[in-house]
Amino acid sequence: MNFLRGVMGGQSAGPQHTEAETIQKLCDRVASSTLLDDRRNAVRALKSLSKKYRLEVGIQAMEHLIHVLQTDRSDSEIIGYALDTLYNIISNDEEEEVEENSTRQSEDLGSQFTEIFIKQQENVTLLLSLLEEFDFHVRWPGVKLLTSLLKQLGPQVQQIILVSPMGVSRLMDLLADSREVIRNDGVLLLQALTRSNGAIQKIVAFENAFERLLDIITEEGNSDGGIVVEDCLILLQNLLKNNNSNQNFFKEGSYIQRMKPWFEVGDENSGWSAQKVTNLHLMLQLVRVLVSPNNPPGATSSCQKAMFQCGLLQQLCTILMATGVPADILTETINTVSEVIRGCQVNQDYFASVNAPSNPPRPAIVVLLMSMVNERQPFVLRCAVLYCFQCFLYKNQKGQGEIVSTLLPSTIDATGNTVSAGQLLCGGLFSTDSLSNWCAAVALAHALQENATQKEQLLRVQLATSIGNPPVSLLQQCTNILSQGSKIQTRVGLLMLLCTWLSNCPIAVTHFLHNSANVPFLTGQIAENLGEEEQLVQGLCALLLGISIYFNDNSLETYMKEKLKQLIEKRIGKENFIEKLGFISKHELYSRASQKPQPNFPSPEYMIFDHEFTKLVKELEGVITKAIYKSSEEDKKEEEVKKTLEQHDSIVTHYKNMIREQDLQLEELKQQISTLKCQNEQLQTAVTQQVSQIQQHKDQYNLLKVQLGKDSQHQGPYTDGAQMNGVQPEEISRLREEIEELKSNRELLQSQLAEKDSLIENLKSSQLSPGTNEQSSATAGDSEQIAELKQELATLKSQLNSQSVEITKLQTEKQELLQKTEAFAKSAPVPGESETVIATKTTDVEGRLSALLQETKELKNEIKALSEERTAIKEQLDSSNSTIAILQNEKNKLEVDITDSKKEQDDLLVLLADQDQKIFSLKNKLKELGHPVEEEDELESGDQDDEDDEDEDDGKEQGHI
């Protein structure tokens, strides 16, 4: 306040002094008047003066205005005037600054008044509570005032809102306001609120902000919408950028799928307004936020897959190949597609299949490379195409092979009708444009990145330089152009290509050294004292020569490792060589290129280093320095140690693979045993069901037997005499047929039981075979279950035998009944009995016989079903027994293999112990010779011992199993 009063006191007297008195009177009226109308009029007058006399109103009226907000909440009009006045005091409008021509000291009034306002945190809480009012004259000024506070002192206001109860939730309600002015200003408020505050970003996201913002964008027409769409997209970027939690929530909420309609740009003639270009640019940037290389790899990969599955990548490729797209949108689309496919094999394969709508159709990669090597294309577009090509080849050995194959003689189109990617890269590599040379060299280096196979394949490429001359290899042509002294950008690109090509590829090093002019050229370049511009080239030449030493397999006697180091010491000097090598990492553009993969340069002359190449320099600089200072004896000892360790590693790897295979076999056997257990449980359940069914059949049979006994006792001679009506003989004949069928079924059942007996005997013999004691616990459990199953089958057999005996008794009783029937058929009817009584008895007997026949049929059907189920059980037992026998044989073989493996592992441990002793003696010799033993060697030997211990433990566990 003293500062503000000092500013006010420094102003000239005159009319302003009169206005100051007026403001003082108005403030007194606001503070002392008891009538609401008087206070309202006074606040309205302060509002009208607040823009022109911002300082005076702010100093004298701020406390009174805050008091009005606290005491007069019931009157929306005075609250609105007070909020507008505070907004005019705190905000810094550009027009206001132009009108006032204020000094730098007065330009800071907004932040000063903001600091006074938020000094009491209750003022911000009061403002948040006022935003709950639905009245337009209260809510809208409140939104503008809070937005201005956030713009002035964002972090402080954010912290107050964060600790305020339901503070963020109240602000989220603004997005649901039906009045567009409040909703749109609410979006601006949330922009300022979420800027650089991860905690608030998470709260806003979980308050359903994504859903509401996407709804607003859809309602406004997606990319064809107005500035509201732009504001929503900026807010979405604030919520998602560098916020892994919100990115995962956005993906899990299936919001990526809702982004696809954004890129449906429509017809070519629909036009591209400035707002549409801005909106689409922000939409593309939002996609890039989700798949940025700076995100965790897992999150980026999941978003890339989701974009392919929902068709978003396909839609982006459609824009990429469309005509009439503005240059900046096309450039940003290329960058977006680049990061969507980077490191994702599925997306990279799809991009390789995209064709441009030309006649004949050409792959999109070829069309993009044509733009990259065309010097008439914009620089930014060429950088974007290079980035797209790099992302296509990133961790994509399949794509690298396809690009290199277009350079090989067998795949080149002899007719010349089509242009391949390899031809375009070669054309750019040897063109007169230095930028095309650099881009083509870097692109070709990415085709060789971490791919030794393609490095060897590229050695086969032959170039026809001129008519009548023999073809020259691509490697030789690169060195020829390098020695011709072209532009620095061209030489840097070629040196980066050669360094990438020769690293980790001894065959390529041999081909490079085979040309006798290469080594003298490199040593000459390094030894010269050139200007600062040539120091980078000298450093790259030193790196290339160091790679030729470090990855040299000594296959050429002329350029063995030791001879090359002697050559460096004589012509250059080791210290000078290391100093020149350090020029690379000390270059000002090196650190800039190492920060991010995208080649983003302000102008072509800054295009010197590639991101992946900086990783290679960081990896090789130290090892090359050590290799230069090592003596020949140390090299020999190191090579011997390396060979020994490689042999040990191969042996250990072999046994690890063997143990891994045995573990897999054990897992398979365990799975098979568990499957057999399940099958046995199912069989046991089936047997239990069969036992219950047999019991039911037995009960039905007993009931039928009782009923037949009652019929034979109670019907007497009347039933026998009723056989003369002509109906009973037919039923009796049918009953005889049914009995015959029962006999045949019984015989069939007995034969099946005999087969089951033989099966049980086979099972017993298999269980008594040698080697039973060596079976695993899981197999023993199966044997117990099979034994239980045998007992159940034996019980089933006894029950079926008893049923057969009972059926035989039933047949005997039926025969007796038939005999009685035939005997009475010959006798005459009893005299004195009427025909009506005889007919009634006959009908009763017929009904009883019909019921008997029906029950007999049901019994027959149930016996048939039982027979079929027994057959199925037999088949399942057969398959189970055969499987158990096979498993037993395999387990015996596996135990023999495990025993052999344990013996081999013991031999290996002895061998490793001997080698450890040799390594220890070598270290002692080195110490005696005065050479320090490096810590890395000790760590490596320690790691080797740990691996040996782990292998020994694994072997013990395997033997125990």
Curated annotation (Swiss-Prot):
Functional description taken from the UniProt entry: General vesicular transport factor required for intercisternal transport in the Golgi stack; it is required for transcytotic fusion and/or subsequent binding of the vesicles to the target membrane. May well act as a vesicular anchor by interacting with the target membrane and holding the vesicular and target membranes in proximity.
Keyword RNA-binding: no
Subcellular location: Cytoplasm, Cytosol; Golgi apparatus membrane
Region (Globular head): 1-641
Biased composition (Acidic residues): 934-955
SUPFAM superfamilies: ARM repeat (SSF48371)
PTM comment text: Phosphorylated in a cell cycle-specific manner; phosphorylated in interphase but not in mitotic cells. Dephosphorylated protein associates with the Golgi membrane; phosphorylation promotes dissociation.
Keyword Transcription regulation among UniProt keywords: no
Subunit relationships: Homodimer. Dimerizes by parallel association of the tails, resulting in an elongated structure with two globular head domains side by side, and a long rod-like tail structure. Interacts with MIF.
Stated name of the protein: General vesicular transport factor p115
First-listed, main subcellular location of the protein, grouped into a coarse class: cytoplasm
PANTHER family attached to this UniProt entry: GENERAL VESICULAR TRANSPORT FACTOR P115
